[in-house]
Amino acid sequence: MASKTKASEALKVVARCRPLSRKEEAAGHEQILTMDVKLGQVTLRNPRAAPGELPKTFTFDAVYDASSKQADLYDETVRPLIDSVLQGFNGTVFAYGQTGTGKTYTMQGTWVEPELRGVIPNAFEHIFTHISRSQNQQYLVRASYLEIYQEEIRDLLSKEPGKRLELKENPETGVYIKDLSSFVTKNVKEIEHVMNLGNQARAVGSTHMNEVSSRSHAIFVITVECSERGSDGQDHIRVGKLNLVDLAGSERQNKAGPNAAGGPATQPTAGGGSGSGSASGSASSGERPKEASKINLSLSALGNVIAALAGNRSTHIPYRDSKLTRLLQDSLGGNAKTIMVATLGPASHSYDESLSTLRFANRAKNIKNKPRVNEDPKDTLLREFQEEIARLKAQLEKKGMLGKRPRRKSSRRKKAVSAPAGYPEGSVIEAWVAEEEDDNNNNHHPPQPILEAALEKNMENYLQDQKERLEEEKAAIQDDRSLVSEEKQKLLEEKEKMLEDLRREQQATELLAAKYKAMESKLLIGGRNIMDHTNEQQKMLELKRQEIAEQKRREREMQQEMLLRDEETMELRGTYSSLQQEVEVKTKKLKKLYAKLQAVKAEIQDQHEEYIRVRQDLEEAQNEQTRELKLKYLIIENFIPPEEKNKIMNRLFLDCEEEQWRFQPLVPAGVNNSQMKKRPTSAVGYKRPISQYARVAMAMGSHPRYRAENIMFLELDVSPPAIFEMEFSHDQEQDPRVLHMERLMRLDSFLERPSTTKVRKSRSWCQSPQRMPPPSTAHASMTSVPLHPATVVDHD
């Protein structure tokens, strides 16, 4: 077993180059990358270089050319990391590179072909094979799958994959995702099913450079908990966490813009390949520039973190600049062992992107992590499972569903065992039991399923016997004529109650046993049902494979060291046989130093050009965001009233954990919303809301029209009104002024009638009789209103 802690460990970086595609070969692009597998060097040639410019060389822990196999990468680079995770370390594997360089192929590969399987399916097989070969250890394996799409965290295993999750931080456990679903898996088939479900919901799309391009960063998390009894007799739990990261590729819109076809995005099929479908959040080609902007921003934040960690001069590490860097905080400079796979494109048109990837990977080599074993953490799910299983087992033993295991001889035989408590006296159970010679040796256990099946069968027989016995007692009670009918009925009811209690207890016991079996099946215990000979052979093959990989690594390191020493030896050699030899040696050394000087100058120039490109990309993203902000300000100023805007601004607050502005709830948390709302002030004491003017008018005792009436209680006056017929047929021949004066005179005569004239008036029950205005007032008010020649109705 490896040591529990190390002072520091460098981040392991490997480079992998894909072959030229048919499209690139048809376009006439040449190969500009050269991979030296033995020395671990990558040589990049500039297709636009001036005559005499030397190619750039980068050295990594390992390199894999276009002819490399998936198994070579996994066995030599990833397998030691998975072994460390099984021992309780945190581990991370992530692929970085330009879009279309084979990141998803490296991480996932082709699931249906064993030779083309990537890192993730090989890791599944490795983990469960190790568990099956282990001895005296209990394992619990759970898996989670998430993606970061446009800086939003989504759970790919949730029923609502588009729902946004929150990123939280705990001082003890570090960064975690709230409400992230996790599934306990028992074998390779189950964890592959979980992976395929997540792939169906992942956002992918088609671009010019890749038909199935990942539009989000995906992280598959495997947590392995192991319980093992220590020398002190106590169970110790180790927790290893493996992050398998498939990053979206960095891209430029002039090269990797959306396909001409546009249309919906595609999704991986259940087999891990690619198919067609509707990807979440990627419904049209118009989303591609926005997706690319978010991808490049998060990768730029990742580059800033790596640059700050590699420089050893920065006191602040900008982990909070992106969701991706916060989730990978432990993997970059923290408690984890990390492997970075830099994927490269060999074509000449990808020179700038390949150079950027190589520089990024070269900086990452200088990051130092501090991995340690996560032993006996507080929040382990395995410990909760063990405690719950022990509690259920105790209840089942108390109810008599589980038999105790006798320990005498080391032979297994079929024998009769006494029935547990609750069975009739003298009943026995035939079951397979294991007898051991040594009471302290518990390696050989009885076949538990056979024993439990026998116990359940006898429990059913016992229940049937009890039913028959109760039926016989009921029949005996009914035939007994010495008992009074009331006593018979009472005894029969007691027997029925006993039978019903027995049935309920049986159902509860069966539910308890089912829960116990379900929880126990989730715990994986190695060393069962495996042939020892085959097991030993597989272990020996793995050890040999690891020794070969370790030997290759040492050979590569020794060759790199020999090259450095040759240069030092050449510089230290100072004795020459003649002046001519000294001139030749120093001329050669001068040319070599001059070439190095030119390479450094070219590197500085490339760095300056790269800086200009990055700045232009950032300025373009900033201008795009500024345009969106101006558009939103324009909408707010023209369509939202100032008072509504102030209400919104007053509700805003900054969420420090998410670093985003949020709205405060309209109703404060903790307030009981079930209480009835108060009646508005304008309607207190009235049947309906009344304006302030109407209330003042009512208080002053003026016109009763301001009174609050209920029309349902209004008494109607059904008496017909007085009707007077007036002749206006000759008015058309007269002068209009004369006609108007005649009308006024008729109105005066009508108003000045004596009170004895019978005229019926109708008024509301709430109206009081009002004094009619004098004739002069009536004249003044009616002079400007011409009367239509029609029937006049007097309503007062």
Curated annotation (Swiss-Prot):
Residues 256-269 have a biased composition (Low complexity). One of its GO terms (molecular function) is ATP binding. Residues 10-367 form the Kinesin motor domain. Microtubule-based anterograde translocator for membranous organelles. This is Kinesin-like protein KIF3C. Residues 401-416 have a biased composition (Basic residues). The lineage of its organism: Eukaryota, Metazoa, Chordata, Craniata, Vertebrata. Heterodimer of KIF3A and KIF3C.
